[in-house]
């Protein structure tokens, strides 16, 4: 379980996050929604250790990870699918997947068959360069790479951005399946409410670096959420 309490984050003098508190439970999808520039990606960077918070705490399965490096947080069980995918265009699909081996013990360094069950296209393109894949296929590759690490916490930052509708549905099915396994907590960062609504067990709505609404489907008024996202 991920637990964040009263997290502040600064880029120099600019404050990106203000007293953010978020929790994400194993077997559930926690969706962080909001318009561009409200701090969603900064929250991801704080969780993964790419940017250190200036106040507050971050714990994973009860252990404080605030002082850990990004690589140590990966070893602790955090898998991250960044906005823009960031696959290696000159490496093959198989080589890209194997970059997920880095935090694993030697005996665990193999690609689980489940990844190819979720995204069969990857199995048929193992020898192709990542840069030759479509945007949607690259997104599936980026998710697969994170899953190679067997994460306890999977963070997906804007996974539908620039993706064709058919693959968005595939990604949605994959997220739903992963949550149903009950082995990881999933944080889905998204600005499109319709996609988030289909998957989320709970919502976190952000504005100007702050959490302004939080709750499950019953507590989050759809009209109010849509109005805030449209502002």
In which residue ranges do the predicted regions lie?
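Helical segment within the ABC ATPase nucleotide-binding domain
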Residues: 169-183
């Amino acid at each position: 379980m991920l637990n964040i309490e009263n997290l502040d984050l600064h880029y120099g003098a600019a404050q990106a996050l203000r007293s953010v508190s978020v929790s994400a439970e194993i077997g559930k999808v926690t969706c962080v929604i909001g318009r561009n520039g409200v701090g969603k990606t900064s929250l991801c960077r704080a969780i993964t250790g790419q940017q250190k918070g200036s106040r507050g705490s971050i714990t994973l399965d009860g252990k404080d990870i605030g002082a850990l490096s990004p690589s140590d947080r990966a070893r602790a069980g955090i898998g991250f699918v960044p906005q823009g995918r960031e696959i290696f265009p000159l490496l093959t699909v198989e080589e890209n997947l194997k970059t997920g081996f880095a935090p694993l013990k030697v005996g665990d360094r193999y690609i689980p068959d489940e990844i190819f069950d979720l995204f069969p296209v990857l199995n048929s393109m193992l020898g192709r360069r990542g840069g030759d894949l479509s945007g949607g296929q690259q997104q599936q590759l980026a998710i697969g790479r994170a899953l190679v690490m067997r994460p306890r916490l999977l963070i997906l930052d804007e996974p539908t951005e620039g993706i064709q509708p058919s693959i968005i549905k595939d990604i949605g099915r994959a997220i739903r399946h992963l949550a149903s396994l009950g082995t990881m907590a999933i944080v889905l960062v998204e600005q499109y409410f319709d996609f988030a609504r289909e998957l989320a067990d709970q919502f976190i709505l952000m504005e100007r670096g702050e959490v302004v609404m939080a709750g499950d489907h019953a507590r989050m008024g759809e009209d109010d959420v849509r109005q805030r996202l449209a502002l």
